[in-house]
Amino acid sequence: MARTTPIARYRNIGISAHIDAGKTTTTERILFYTGVNHKIGEVHDGAATMDWMEQEQERGITITSAATTAFWSGMAKQFDAHRINIIDTPGHVDFTIEVERSMRVLDGAVMVYCAVGGVQPQSETVWRQANKYRVPRIAFVNKMDRMGANFLRVVEQLKTRLAANPVPLQLAIGAEDAFTGVVDLVKMKAINWNDEDQGTTFTYEDIPADMQDLAEEWRSNLIEAAAEASEELMEKYLGGEELTEEEIKAGLRHRVLTNEIILVTCGSAFKNKGVQAMLDAVIEYLPAPTDVESIKGILPDGKDTSAERHSDDNEPFSALAFKIATDPFVGNLTFFRVYSGVVNSGDTVLNPVKDRKERFGRIVQMHANKREEIKEVRAGDIAAAIGLKDVTTGDTLCDINAPIILERMEFPEPVISVAIEPKTKADQEKMGIALGRLAQEDPSFRVSTDEESGQTIIAGMGELHLDVLVDRMRREFKVEANVGKPQVAYRETIRSTVEQEGKFVRQSGGRGQFGHVWLRIEPMEPGGVGYEFANEIVGGVVPKEYIPAVDKGIQEQMKNGVLAGYPIVDVKVALFDGSYHEVDSSEMAFKIAGSMGFKEGFMKAKPALLEPIMKVEVETPEDYMGDVIGDLNRRRGMIDGMEDMTTGKIVRAQVPLSEMFGYATDLRSQTQGRASYSMEFLKYNEAPSNVAQAIIEARKAK
């Protein structure tokens, strides 16, 4: 089967935004104008096509990034058909992992901002992730029809809050109820969309007389931005010559692709204005798979030799699985992005991360939650496979004869855990299956068993994250469960260096046990590898076959903690001396000696308890400012700063996670429901001694 759309006409884009910027409505309109959806789905009624989990429709927030394919030939049918693959990304901070993994497989992004609320705290998190993966992006300022909408104020905030270099491509004509259309600064024409056919058709008109000067001013800003793309354009511009429309667009495209500028468009998705022109901007300014760098990876040859793949059908097949979803009808759906080559349904490929072969049973292309079966996928495509057995998010799938491991995604460690048990014995097994499925879908969600109590523990990125998962278990797997009180993931560490002997001797008749080691235990830089073992034995005083056993004994003790039973981090241990017995020494004896030595040494090396600190941002009306700050101080918060917003203030603080439980309810009652907050993990800090003491005693009492 030949390629139907040339790869240069592909656009793999994400639509990313703060919770209420109107992202889902914007995506809905895209699907409507590209002719996929004939009835526009409204989030207000909980019927949007992209939000396909029941919960998302109920809560009105987008949780999973659904992938959808659409075609667009331009507002005036001025292009050949372009294939746009859209990954919808969530805007809630507990789901940052979803944003991170979608950024990884995108070539470009559309950032949606609310014309009233502007750049909100959550937008910064998404922005940082887009920077991390160097994703070229354009902005769409939505909700121009709302009270208090102000396009140029949002442009200014992109500069001040995100340190971006925004260049408006359009200006809004009017605002609030008087918002009628946009000025296209490249063509210097006003665009008016037809209300009768929901904005499918439009007319170019003259720019309103009262906007002519403003339009001239912003057009010269746009042309200057385009001219900076190359020396030739700059010379022409400085020489006073007019740049042609083609030259302006080529210059702007070059600067968007190199991440030098962010083009800003505007409109009101709800009122069917502006999304159409934003789609044209996606085609004209965002990259095709061939415009971005080739994908880097390593060969699974044990030497980590670096390798790369280009967006080309003739290169060996390589793809990245970026999301696993459980589907009610077919089981696991593995969403993947093809970076190179071609794969057909029925082909067998390699998962080099797990060194397993996988067969592509059926390949489907998703349109929100409707699916269409296809026979093959090619470089640049995004699709889902049914029936892959052992693939986790971030795994590579590739040609068996040309193995490569593509750059993996890094997932944060969970910071909050709760005990969970099924309401009835009959649900025990069902709960196990459900949790297993959910953990496979979401790498930032972990399931484990507490060895002492036998309870099942689930851990994740925040209270909302775990709520949503427990809720999904109830709906999708019909498992009712009781959830315990949230527990914080504390860690233990040391602050000074000690040398400690560890000796395990049992010699009373029969085969004895003898293990003897000397360890040097020292603190390491926080946030690094977490643990390092150094073998400094000289002259075989401890035979080399016993050395891994010492390391293993130390690691087991680290997992179980010493102070209060929490995992130990940021410690380097060197084995520098010891002795052995010809007959009685064994791996077991050295493992116990290592563990004993480490445990004793740890308690002498100024042990400390670490607690997770969260970055908290609260948006509040000014009247409640004092209460909010007072409350954060009571929660041992450290205020980082404040910022003015149109609707009040943003307070930024660092607060220990243990103090943040139930914060949503408290904040609601303090501010009569008018404030909102977001919170994400920042770092581990040493807990104050009174707090640490209370935690240690509570653990011992158990």
Curated annotation (Swiss-Prot):
Subcellular location: Cytoplasm
Annotated keywords: Cytoplasm, Elongation factor, GTP-binding, Nucleotide-binding, Protein biosynthesis
Pfam families with a match to the protein in the record: EFG_C, EFG_III, EFG_IV, GTP_EFTU, GTP_EFTU_D2
Disulfide bonding pattern of the chain: none
GO cellular component, one term: cytoplasm
InterPro entries given in the database record: EFG_II, EFG_III, EFG_III/V, EFG_IV, EFG_V, EFG_V-like, EFTu-like_2, G_TR_CS
Gene3D superfamilies linked to this entry: 3.30.230.10, 3.30.70.240, Elongation Factor G (Translational Gtpase), domain 3, P-loop containing nucleotide triphosphate hydrolases, Translation factors
Coiled-coil regions listed: none
Molecular function terms from GO: GTP binding; GTPase activity; guanosine tetraphosphate binding; translation elongation factor activity
Record family assignment: Belongs to the TRAFAC class translation factor GTPase superfamily. Classic translation factor GTPase family. EF-G/EF-2 subfamily.
Annotated protein name in UniProt: Elongation factor G
Protein species of origin: Photorhabdus laumondii subsp. laumondii (strain DSM 15139 / CIP 105565 / TT01)
Gene expressing this chain: fusA
